[in-house]
Structures are given as C-alpha cells and as structure tokens.
C-alpha cells in the first residue's frame, strides 16, 4: 500500500510534466530572453519566494553565479531570501509585507529582473516586491501554480507568467524545479551555444 502511494507520486509528477511541456515552453523561452537581456546588459536578477519557494530562489541565484551544468562567466543574481538578519530586521521593525520590496527598492534598477516564486500567487510580500520592481522599470518573471492569483493580475505586457497547470503545492514545486533547470540551461545555451551535456 505504501509503495503504491509512492509510485503514484512518481506517475502523477511525470504526467504533469509531460502535459505541461508544450504549455510552458513558450513562457519559459520568454523568461530566458528576459534574463539574458538583463545579464548581458550589466543587470542582475533578484529572486524571492516564501518557504520552499525561498529555497528555489536561492537555488536559481546559485545557478547564475556558480554555474549550472557548464563552465561560464558568473551572472549577477541575488536571492532576497538569503540574509536572515535583514529579513528579521524588516519583520521586527517594519511591515513584514515590505521585506522584499525594500530590497528591490534598494538594489533594483531599470533593466533588472525580479524572479518571484509562489504556489498560489497571493503572497503579500511578493505583491509588494512586484509593485516595487515596476516602480524601478524592472521586468518581473513569476513562477506560480494555477492560475497565478493576484500576482498574475499585476503583471505588465513585458512581464512573464509561468503558471504550472496544477493546484497541489507539491506538484507545482516539482515543476518549478524543472522550470528553473530549463531557464538555467536556456540561458547557458544562448550564451555558449547548443551542446549536449555528457551524462
């Protein structure tokens, strides 16, 4: 019984990824172009999310700076979720919904990209960060579940929404990980050329 339950997780995850491949390839390609335009113009990616999505933000920043699967020059990226002192100071002395927005206002510049990761798209601190990014003329890339919540409604025509067609948080996060891999690989392919990665 337990093994069947475990196997079902694998099946459900694989099914969702297969079904989402065609739907998500276009917005992922648009996100690759947004990140590429940013970093090749001297800009940076600011990534944020809450809970497990915070870890995903840190993972993407690490891929940019330390590399993904191939050697390449470092790309400027920062996870806004990494500085515990700053985050707890903001939570203790200010409106906690502004914890990422303050960093966007301090660090963001026109041409930069804000990468916001969320399951439901209604996180008040991500909404505030998106508003701050728009004030700075930054492009916003959102990874969300279905249908993207309030965050999706805030996006401009130049922003990118990658909305995983599922409601279950675990499935959405599994696809987010794959999307971040596709995004990192796409940037590398555009910078370094197409190349098969050896096993």
Predicted regions mapped to residue ranges:
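Short beta->alpha connector loops at strand-helix junctions that form conserved
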Residues: 81, 118, 144, 161-168
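Short, glycine/polar-rich helix-capping loops at beta-to-alpha or helix-loop-helix junctions
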Residues: 143-158
């Amino acid at each position: 019984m337990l093994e069947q339950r475990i196997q079902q997780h694998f099946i459900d995850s694989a099914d969702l990824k297969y079904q989402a491949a065609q739907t998500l390839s276009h917005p992922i390609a648009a996100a690759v172009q947004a990140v590429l335009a940013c970093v090749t113009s001297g800009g940076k990616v600011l990534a944020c999310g809450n809970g497990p999505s915070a870890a995903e933000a840190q993972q993407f920043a690490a891929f940019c700076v330390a590399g993904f699967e191939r050697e390449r020059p470092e790309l400027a990226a920062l996870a806004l979720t990494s500085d515990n002192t700053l985050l707890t100071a903001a939570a203790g002395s200010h409106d906690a919904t502004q914890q990422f927005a303050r960093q966007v206002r301090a660090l963001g510049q026109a041409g930069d990209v804000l990468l916001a990761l969320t399951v439901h798209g209604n996180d008040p601190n991500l909404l505030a960060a998106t508003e701050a990014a728009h004030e700075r003329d930054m492009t916003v890339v959102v990874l969300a579940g279905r249908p993207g919540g309030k965050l999706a409604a805030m996006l401009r025509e130049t922003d990118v929404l990658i909305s995983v067609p599922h409601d279950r948080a675990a499935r959405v996060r599994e696809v987010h990980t794959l999307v971040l891999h596709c995004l990192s690989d796409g940037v590398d392919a555009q910078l370094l050329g197409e190349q098969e990665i050896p096993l």
